[in-house]
Amino acid sequence: QQRYLNAKRYVKLAIVADRSMVTKHNGKLKKLRKWIYRIVNTINEVYRSLNILVALVYLEIWSKEDLINVTSAAKDTLASFGNWRATDLLKRRSHDAAHLLTNIKFDGTTVGKAYVASMCQQDSSVGINQDHSKINLLVALTMAHELGHNLGMSHDVVNTEKQCNCGTCVMAPTISDQISKLFSNCSKNDYENFLTLYKPQCILNEPSKTDIVSPPVCGNELLEVGEECDCGSPETCQNPCCDAATCKLTSGSQCAKGLCCDQCKFSKSGTECRAAKDDCDIAESCTGQSADCPTDDLQRNGKPCQNNAGYCYNGKCPIMLNQCISFYGSNATVAPDICFNYNLKGEGNFYCRKEQATIFPCAQKDKKCGRLFCVLGPTGKRISCKNTYSEDDPNYGMVDLGTKCEDGKVCNSNRECVDVNTAY
């Protein structure tokens, strides 16, 4: 748990500057870009104390017209920006969070707004920020504050039960000229709770050099184009393989970090660098030619797993018993065959396939690839065939793809029970 909490995190940030920002900078896009690069450099500095690096991986400037309606109503603007990000931006460019920078003044004293504990979520990992000051640092601290909300942090309130021992930290409820670059204990606790509760996966992945669109800065701990390594400032760098002042490897070093870097040299070929997580995963070993561990590889689809209870499918071992337990708890088991006969009817929620409004009943041989049936506890003479469904998600409560439906057979994407050797 402590190792999970202490791991370095990387927020891959996309920033969108709207039309009002272009007007504010008199159409000088180079000047506007510089302004934004400075903002991101400051945000990265602020977050390094939490072992988080913030990298700008995408910058979009709406120089002709805004792609959403940016208004003084912050709540509405945030909602439309979140929707646009999910339906448009994410399809074009991979990133962890997107923030809008605008010169439109929001209602009241609001200078920014973001969804709380939303990092890595498709529709809510967003924030909006008003470019409210001539002082770059103050705008940067506003965006750092809104990003803090995405990472699960609430405002620092100074009251008796929640003494945050900081009136001017990043998550202070209102911005002031006294604001500091520090996080309060409350913010640190909020962030750790967010990591524990939500387990956001996307921020564990380090951006590659070529993903970062801002000019390289030696000493910001991010490995960028033109750098061989970056271990922070010469004062703080602890890495003997890297020359902090130049971001070049020290004499005789092959590497400065990586799962396959051992004392500044590439690990020997064959050294295991990532253990197999389970029987549908494969262990990876170093090549001897690189500091990086090869890409995480999975067992082939159809390989038997969990003592032949199932077959591997995309790195998982889907079996009906585990699906029942996930729906109904630990005393659930798979229902007897008689329950699965409901899937032969093709009525209501009992079927193998549904295309638009047309329902296709299961053939006898495919009945265990339709709706999943479970029972709770020991069954007497009367069997209660438990099943579940959702109006929003047609696959919810169905037997998972790749699940073993008979010996040597699995459910394919058409929900047919087919030979495991020809299914994939």
From Swiss-Prot:
InterPro entries, A to Z: ADAM_Cys-rich (IPR006586), Disintegrin_CS (IPR018358), Disintegrin_dom (IPR001762), Disintegrin_dom_sf (IPR036436), MetalloPept_cat_dom_sf (IPR024079), Peptidase_M12B (IPR001590), Reprolysin_adamalysin (IPR034027)
Kindly list every residue the record annotates as glycosylated: 69, 185, 331
**What EC class does the entry list?**
hydrolase
Q: Which family does it belong to?
A: Belongs to the venom metalloproteinase (M12B) family. P-III subfamily. P-IIIa sub-subfamily.
Q: Which organism is it from?
A: Gloydius brevicauda (Korean slamosa snake)
Keyword Nucleotidyltransferase included in the entry's annotation: no
Protein name, per record: Zinc metalloproteinase-disintegrin-like brevilysin H2a
Q: Where is the Disintegrin domain?
A: 215-301
Which parts of the sequence bind Ca(2+) 3?
281, 284, 296
Q: Which residues form a coiled coil?
A: none
